[in-house]
Amino acid sequence: MLNHTERAEVLVHALPYIQRYRGKIIVVKYGGNAMISNELRETVINDIILMKCVGIEPIVVHGGGPDISDLLNRLNHKSEFINGLRYTDDITIEVVQMVLGGKVNKNLVSLIEKFGGKAIGLCGMDGSLLKAKKIESDNDLGYVGEITKVNTEILKTTISSGYIPVVGSVALGEDDNKAYNINADTCAAKIASALKAERLILLTDVPGVMKDPKDISTLISTLRLHQIPKLCLEGIIKGGMIPKIDCCVEAIRMGVEKATILDGRVPHSILLELFSNEGIGTMIY
């Protein structure tokens, strides 16, 4: 337990970082075990509220894969994945809208309100916040889309009114006005890019990019863009890490200052990443 002096020193240590990020937009993709564990969920929400309280402008983007699968199971409708993406037929897209625009989104908003923050829940269909087109691939994915446009004014208005935007990753078709399921990492990256955010943070269930996935001491703390192709060729960046890295790279090329892949299983990982020299994830810039 910290004594009073040590607590004061922690706050003083954080001051330069608070000053650095004050007024800056930081997009947090919220997912993984941090959404499932009640304890972790509360620490993430408190981190986000604290960011807002000290003048940082957080935007929360979320998926809801486990909840979508759970509801589909209860409807006796099979979940099917193709290359890591959920095949989204007519029934599935209805469930996606209910979960991402309803249950998960509103639960996060109510939790933020419970702990003293102010939040507004949105999905990409609200005010045409997110426009998308169908992903064309060799294997038909159904109503799975890629974002073509972000209505930044909705987010800026929400922020300037003192609220934390909480965005569910479902979008409106640019041509057919139908709902499209969007990968949450991609959604967060597109929003960060459109707003030229200071930081993009992807919460996940691994510490970051590691040379040896079984050895935390091999965590790569910082990555420059030019180093990434070599790590892919060496097989260090592989599997599910590849699309996350791709999201970060795209965001940086579109004007985001830095992107971080962060272990959401670590309590207060967002604050540890933002308010210390060392950070705890893999920062890409």
UniProtKB/Swiss-Prot annotation:
Record bears the keyword Kinase: yes
Stored SUPFAM superfamilies: Carbamate kinase-like
GO molecular function: acetylglutamate kinase activity; ATP binding
Residues at the site labelled Transition state stabilizer: K29, K244
Binding site for substrate: G64, G65, R86, N181
Assigned keywords, A-Z: Amino-acid biosynthesis, Arginine biosynthesis, ATP-binding, Cytoplasm, Kinase, Nucleotide-binding, Transferase
Location(s) in or outside the cell: Cytoplasm
Entry EC no(s): 2.7.2.8
Cellular component aspect of the GO annotation: cytoplasm
Top-level taxon: Bacteria
Pathway(s) served: Amino-acid biosynthesis; L-arginine biosynthesis; N(2)-acetyl-L-ornithine from L-glutamate: step 2/4
Top-level EC class as recorded in UniProt: transferase
Catalysed reactions, as listed in the record: N-acetyl-L-glutamate + ATP = N-acetyl-L-glutamyl 5-phosphate + ADP
Family, similarity comment: Belongs to the acetylglutamate kinase family. ArgB subfamily.
Function in brief: Catalyzes the ATP-dependent phosphorylation of N-acetyl-L-glutamate.
Full protein name: Acetylglutamate kinase
Species whose genome carries this gene: Clostridium beijerinckii (strain ATCC 51743 / NCIMB 8052) (Clostridium acetobutylicum)
Gene: argB
